[in-house]
Amino acid sequence: MTPTLTPPLQWQRRHVLSLQDFTVAELDIVLQTALSFQEVLNRRTKKVPTLQARVVANLFFESSTRTRNSFELAAKRLSADILNFSPGTSALNKGETILDTAKTLWAMGAEFMVIRHRQSGVPHTIAAEMDRLGGQVAVLNAGDGLHEHPSQALLDLFTLCQLYDPRQPRCALLQGKKIVIVGDIRHSRVARSNLYSLKTAGADVHLAGPPTLLPPEFADYGATLHWTLEPALADADIVMTLRLQRERMDQYLIPSLREYHQHFGMTHERLRLCRPDVRVLHPGPVNRGVELSSALLDDPQFSLVNQQVSSGVAVRMALLYLMGTYHGVKP
């Protein structure tokens, strides 16, 4: 059994490329649909025929473990046929362009393209080309450069809303909640997508990080900026830490990983500054002892990291299903 969308909840997006212009109603549709698929995943038979005989192509031009496997499992749970593209063994090595690769997969019958690339805008370019071809292909951005990572932010949103109401997750639950995002904001596509979704949901978003990783222009997103961690954590409801890419140390953006943890790493001691019922998120992979202490990461009283991973499959099933309804998939 798959969700049935009533007329007020009809999905109107062919592609999911950015969360910048998502409405509260659209976010709530994703949350409600993900809840339905979470119920499917909790059954003995964890599969529905929703996308049976439909072709989902995973084009990951950048390495990934969690996101790629999560999308692949989501497509399998929907009974889709899956094409996994591997750039290392593809015609890209022979000079083929990315657009030509996408058009080749379209010609083979791909109806959904899940795309990750290190350059910002690649999924948008492919989506525009698919629209030009009139092929009814749905494109989902699985992370593009420093731009966005919509499905990660949506699974974070689902995880948070379920924290406050497991049976009816909705954006209104985050109204006025103080959510602190800590780390390398400058280079984080996860931070950007979360900023869009959390602000739309009505959360009070704060950003914390060293000045080299948190430029002042991020105030334009409607967030409060902090260049020291302790003031940001005061009475926080949620703390979301971001992975620190080790190459930032090579670029002299931070003195050392040890010093970063000393000033911006989350520990049980720092959680005392937050509300007693605070919870901690991280998109993964985690650098233990850098963004989070191992003790905090493994503490189920505070850490929602495993719940985020579990939520990811249901949310990505929801996105593929919803995009499919735009293209004629029947509930």
From Swiss-Prot:
Belongs to the aspartate/ornithine carbamoyltransferase superfamily. ATCase family. Its EC number is 2.1.3.2. The gene is pyrB. It is an enzyme of class 2 (transferase). This is Aspartate carbamoyltransferase catalytic subunit. One of its GO terms (molecular function) is amino acid binding. It comes from Thermosynechococcus vestitus (strain NIES-2133 / IAM M-273 / BP-1). Catalyzes the condensation of carbamoyl phosphate and aspartate to form carbamoyl aspartate and inorganic phosphate, the committed step in the de novo pyrimidine nucleotide biosynthesis pathway. GO terms for biological process: 'de novo' pyrimidine nucleobase biosynthetic process; 'de novo' UMP biosynthetic process; amino acid metabolic process. Pathway: Pyrimidine metabolism; UMP biosynthesis via de novo pathway; (S)-dihydroorotate from bicarbonate: step 2/3.
